Amino acid sequence: VKSGAYPNHARAYENVKSIPHYLKRVGYRVALAGKTHIDPKPVYPFEYIDEFAEPEDEDVPVIDGWRYPKVRNMLRESSEKKKPFCLFLCSNEPHSPYTKGDPAPYKETKLSPQQFNFHRQSYAKYLAEISYFDGQVGEVIRMLEEQGLRENTLLIAATEQGSGFPFGKWTCYEMGVASGMIASWPGNIEAGSETDAIVEYTDIVPTFLDAAGAPIPEVLDGLTLLPLLRGETNRHSQYSYSLQTTRGVNGYKAPFGVRSVVGGEYRYIRNLFPENEFSIPVSRNLMKETALLDETEKARAARYLNRPPEELYHVIKDPYCQENLIDKPALQETKNRLADALSNWMDEQGDTGRDVELDAHGRQANWYKRN
């Protein structure tokens, strides 16, 4: 999101440029508050605001109607000095152990086909944290309105990835990589408009540069979203690519790299180590929790842990990726088209698959290695 590069370039080297470099050149103040997870600092020369990264065990108190006075002060200064700004507000919500907000309204919420009944309490807490995040966004909007900045500010609210429940985060299933994104810019984006165009996080940096009137470097992987947001087109990218590694994830046992592409109505998934069992803390907890359940529930858990070399899902009819269509004769052309697109993208990215996966831990971002 901050460098404009695909996630297989997670480790940033000293010569890499990021959004602060690009926007500062055209006079912008570029700041970040909250969750950082970036390194080395010279590659990301943000102005860092010590707010928004909240303690897990308590809500931030509201004082004089506000929770984030430092963020508010930054916006006030930008308004008074008529200084254009780009501000990343990186919330930690929702994230386990899910301690923010009130879960009571969500205790009877219907579970998805991916979840198990013993997840109900955690799911209610997860939804409570989403409501808490919604409140954070609302407070930022109030700050912009207070300072007279709302009408001329492009606001994008986006989620990081799917939930931390099975078949979500740490996978390339639809609920693992599909993310919510809402954009608002009075006079530029029609309120209430929607699109099913395929977009990616790599599109954020070129979009902000375009909105600021800054040059968009050809080296960036993404494309500006402004024509799409302004309703000038209803198409963007033909494909969106995803990848996942278990290498370096706390408690992993064996490599289980995943690559995926979505195009149109179908998602194709390539599991690089199908001979291995998918193993991270969530998977091992799942086996313990389903040990005494019936065979149907055990089979669902086993499907999460043991996967075939290839998978294909109709993500419109089957967004929870329950029916693998990889062997359907009528879909072989679709499968081959997506498989070729994924292979071509991997070649472009220098991703050789299994070999890259085995070397992944040595190429992770330094901040991740330290944690």
Where are these regions (language model features)?
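Formylglycine-dependent sulfatase
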Residues: 1-311, 319-347, 353-354, 358, ...
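C-terminal helical cap and adjacent loop that interface with cofactors, partners, or active-site loops
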Residues: 316
